[in-house]
Amino acid sequence: MRELEQALRGGLADLALVLEDRQIALLLDYLALIQKWTQVYNLTAVREPAEMLTHHLLDSLAVIQPLRRQLAGLRDQTPDTDTANVRLLDVGSGAGLPGVVIAICCPEITVDCVDTVAKKVAFIRQVAATLKLANLHGLHARVESLTGPYRVICSRAFASLADFTRLSSAALAPQGLWLAMKAKDPAEEVAALPATVKVFHVEHLVVPGLGADRCIVWMRQSAV
């Protein structure tokens, strides 16, 4: 565990992300829960703790600073909009990535992790209870049945951009943002989006220890 903590702290430094010791401990406890549950429920194909740290925790931690910047920009652009109590929906959350990581790092954000697989939702709820994360909730539902409103709707390896935005559009708040984590150049998926969805930024990420392309596709509803 000591080696994992050192690797985590090194990754946080590379990401220029400052967290409290308590939050770092929560991230490591969360990683331990993933390891424990995966032995029985196969939450993730990644089994080695060091690989979990890189492929899951650090990969998800890479979105924290971009998310904070976008929310700060939203406050500046729409000062009459309440951004003090942000609700975020993590679609197809699986083992809680990136939703649980966001809940730990951003306690001011209420995070709902939705999945259609009951055992994965049960895991999210167990994480919330064990780590005492009052801002984290697991929802066993289809995303298209949710109405929100959510200021941010995110996904990581859930579906194509077109399907992601179509299925979750009813849950997006006015002036809300879609955050889609992608592992490759999303040009083809962007081209397939309807006119009602506008991509306003493709943000390339560097994940410490991960030699692979990562990016965030930021979208909002278009006036068209």
Curated annotation (Swiss-Prot):
GO cellular component: cytosol
Amino acids binding S-adenosyl-L-methionine: G92, L97, V143, E144, R156
Signal peptide per UniProt: none
Pfam family, one: GidB
Subcellular location(s) per record: Cytoplasm
Catalytic class of the enzyme: transferase
Keywords, in A-Z order: Cytoplasm, Methyltransferase, rRNA processing, S-adenosyl-L-methionine, Transferase
Catalytic activity of the protein: guanosine(527) in 16S rRNA + S-adenosyl-L-methionine = N(7)-methylguanosine(527) in 16S rRNA + S-adenosyl-L-homocysteine
Keyword match rRNA processing: yes
MF terms in GO: rRNA (guanine-N7-)-methyltransferase activity
Disulfide bonds: none
Family note: Belongs to the methyltransferase superfamily. RNA methyltransferase RsmG family.
Function field: Specifically methylates the N7 position of guanine in position 527 of 16S rRNA.
The protein's name in its UniProt record: Ribosomal RNA small subunit methyltransferase G
Source organism of this protein record: Albidiferax ferrireducens (strain ATCC BAA-621 / DSM 15236 / T118)
